[in-house]
Amino acid sequence: FVVMIPRRGTYVADISIRDINEIYEIRACLDELAAGLAAERITDDELETLNRLLVEFGQHISTGDMEKIVEVDTAFHEVLYMASRNARLHSIINNLREQVTSIRGRSMSYPGRLHDTMNEHRTLVDFIAARDVEGARNAARSHIENAEHTLMQSISPTIWDGKV
């Protein structure tokens, strides 16, 4: 990911297993919070947008267009964060976005992960639509943990034991 140091410049940093683990730990907490708040606060229009994005995600899986898949996945999460109605949470998540984006593609390119992601998103939307706060929180956390597990498997199946 890109690191900017004032008066020193910008460079692309190597990302370690520890960095990945830390990013996913933070993201699991933040997405869990956002999903729970969204279950309480989402509008019908936002819910409709999430459902439309799920359909688009499936269509792009069929064509194998990874650029569009990542674009739709990012839009899905953005709607979820906006639906939380918590500007500070959204700001914190946006600060992580560049780091998440730099590793997301690798996780999503793992065999079967795209379909798993679509199913996990569907489950999350179902809980949000039902206004099930706890279900939404659990689904969001599970989705992020599954993405982390897949990423670690894609890096090296022998190093993944659930903890780094």
Predicted regions and their residues:
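Short linear motifs at protein or domain termini
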Residues: 1-40, 45, 82, 148-164
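ATP/adenylate-binding site constellation spanning eukaryotic-like Ser/Thr protein kinases
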Residues: 7, 17, 74, 86, ...
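Amphipathic alpha-helical dimerization/coiled-coil segments
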Residues: 33-62, 71
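Residue-level detector of well-ordered alpha-helical segments, enriched
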Residues: 46-49, 68, 72, 88, ...
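C-terminal all-alpha effector/ligand-binding and dimerization domain
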Residues: 51-58, 63, 75, 98, ...
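Amphipathic alpha-helical effector-binding/dimerization core
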Residues: 20, 71-75, 83-89
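Amphipathic alpha-helical interaction elements
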Residues: 39, 58, 81-85, 129
